[in-house]
Amino acid sequence: MIEFIFKANKSITNGEINLKDLPGSSGRMDLVCRCVSSAFFLSHDLRRDTIFYSVHYGAPNPPVAIKFVGSELKRVSPDERSIALFIKKALDKSPMQLWKESTSGIYIAKKEFKDIILEKKNEGKEIYYLHKDGEDIENIFNKENNAENKNIVFILGDHIGIGEEDEKFLEDIGALKVSLSPLELHANHCITIVHNALDKAKLK
């Protein structure tokens, strides 16, 4: 199972999403939608071995976490508007501490970014923080240490990043920094590159 945990610093936390202005009044909700599309959609199929979390810290009720489970998703299309509609449906619900299903494969909860990461750590999963100063991903996932049958979690942030406090938290729990490029990349592009690296590692 491959999991991504994405920190959306400005994305709103209620259902008042303006589908005509996802980057603006919706708090860069376009970034969340692009990440969902990159996490799951193949040309004619879905990645069913993937889970994606988006943790929103925008107004008015942060934090709110949304979970997308690839093996359960139905009726979602890869375009931003379709994904935003499903996010809107989730955010229209009142989030509780426990995950509550909004539509097939999409859940909402009142959870912190750190809390979700810590849950994964306590489950024994390997935590990787996507950062340009980390170790090259192809050195980590190769013939000797491939991704098959592993439970792997990747942490990434939006255009703002995850912040110094969360970086320190990741360091404290032993997360390994992984680099995809010496350049700063868009989060959705990072997800595509990660999938590609893991796909190749599984075939070696």
Swiss-Prot record:
UniProt-annotated binding residues for S-adenosyl-L-methionine: 130, 157, 180-185, 190
UniProt cross-references to InterPro entries, sorted A to Z: Alpha/beta_knot_MTases (IPR029028), TrmY (IPR007158), tRNA_m1G_MTases_N (IPR029026)
Any one Gene Ontology BP term: tRNA methylation
Reaction(s) catalysed by this chain's protein: pseudouridine(54) in tRNA + S-adenosyl-L-methionine = N(1)-methylpseudouridine(54) in tRNA + S-adenosyl-L-homocysteine + H(+)
GO CC, alphabetical: cytoplasm
Pfam family, one: Methyltrn_RNA_2
Recorded GO MF terms: S-adenosylmethionine-dependent methyltransferase activity; tRNA methyltransferase activity
Subcellular location as annotated: Cytoplasm
Positions of transmembrane segments: none
UniProt keyword list: Cytoplasm, Methyltransferase, S-adenosyl-L-methionine, Transferase, tRNA processing
Origin: domain of life: Archaea
SUPFAM superfamilies: alpha/beta knot
Gene3D superfamilies: 3.40.1280.10
EC number(s) from the headed UniProt entry: 2.1.1.257
Family to which this protein belongs: Belongs to the methyltransferase superfamily. TrmY family.
Alphabetical list of NCBIfam families matching this protein: PRK02135.1 (NF002560)
UniProt function note: Specifically catalyzes the N1-methylation of pseudouridine at position 54 (Psi54) in tRNAs.
Subunit structure comment from the entry: Homodimer.
Protein name (database record): tRNA (pseudouridine(54)-N(1))-methyltransferase
Organism of derivation: Methanococcus aeolicus (strain ATCC BAA-1280 / DSM 17508 / OCM 812 / Nankai-3)
Lineage: Archaea, Methanobacteriati, Methanobacteriota, Methanomada group, Methanococci
